Structure formats: structure tokens, C-alpha cells
Amino acid sequence: MADLATFNWREPDYRPIWTERLERLQRLRADPGILPGLKAFYADHPVEFINDWLCTFDPRNVERGIEAVTPFLLFPKQAAFVEFVVARWRGREDWLCEKSRDMGVSWLCVAIATWMWLFHPGVVVGFGSRKEEYVDKLGDPKSLFWKIRETLNLLPAELLPKGYNERAHAPSMRIVNPENGSTIVGESGDN
């Protein structure tokens, strides 16, 4: 992984990151036998999984001459947040996060949920909001489930569950992993 300590966050150049990801994917495709070990590694290393493979979407980037889809590269505080959430989950501890704007908390939670869904059998991750459209509105990038579906769509096929098909496994308010039984579900306060 590129050295994020020297990455220019104010004027990002994602080309080296995309090149590194492409090279990683080419190595994986040249030697598919490494996939089980890679998945075993990522099952215990969510920060590395996010930094190595996941992307985010921000249409405001276009105004700055940056692609709307960019590699998801975690700031140090974001990496600490991921580790905090995973530690609470593993320890079966309650926790609370006060969500601020434009710090990526929604995308972080989407990334963590995606990681759990991919690598931990039988997990059920829930997302909720006071309105259903904030949780899942097909085609709306503001909804959490759009972000999850887009995250999955941007992953290499090798990292997706065997047999996964968005139409069959990601209907409204639910995303099912056909390989390991994990599910991401949505709830809303709408009556």
C-alpha cells in the first residue's frame, strides 16, 4: 500500500493508487491460489481491506477536477474509528458515535458493514434512519444502501461472494451474502 503519511490530501493524485490496485488485481488473477490466504488476512485486517480495495463516491469532486469515484483511503482518525468499531463488535460492547458532516462516517460504516458481510459468516448488520429513503432508495447516492451496492459493484469479482447477483441478493432494505449467509438489513421509522 502507498505511504498514506505522505499522501497529499488537499490535492490528491489517485493515479499511483489506481496503478497499485491494478497491479494487485493482476497478481491475484495470475495466481488465484493466493485468494484464500488474502481473504483470511483481510478477515482480520479491515483497515487494510478498505485501503487496498474499497472506493467512495463524491459528486462534489468533479468541481475540483477529481473523479467522483476515488479509492477509499483512510485518514488516521478514520482508521482508528474502524479499529474502534471492530473492537466494540468483537467485544460485544455497546458504543455511540456522534456523526458530523463531511467526515465520512456514513462511508466508514458502509465499509465496515461490507467487510463484515464479506468475511464473517452469519453476521447481520443493521442500518436505520427516521425515513426509509435515507436508508434505501434505489438509484439515490444519498441513501446508505446505494453506497453499499456501489461499494460492492466497484469490488473485483474475485472478492465478491460466489453466486452474488445484485438483482437477486440486494432487494430493497436487504443485502444477502449467498456464500456465507451474512445480511445487511435496513430499518426506518416510517409508518
Give the role of each language-model region.
Residues A2-N191:
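Phosphate/NTP-binding elements of NTP-utilizing enzymes
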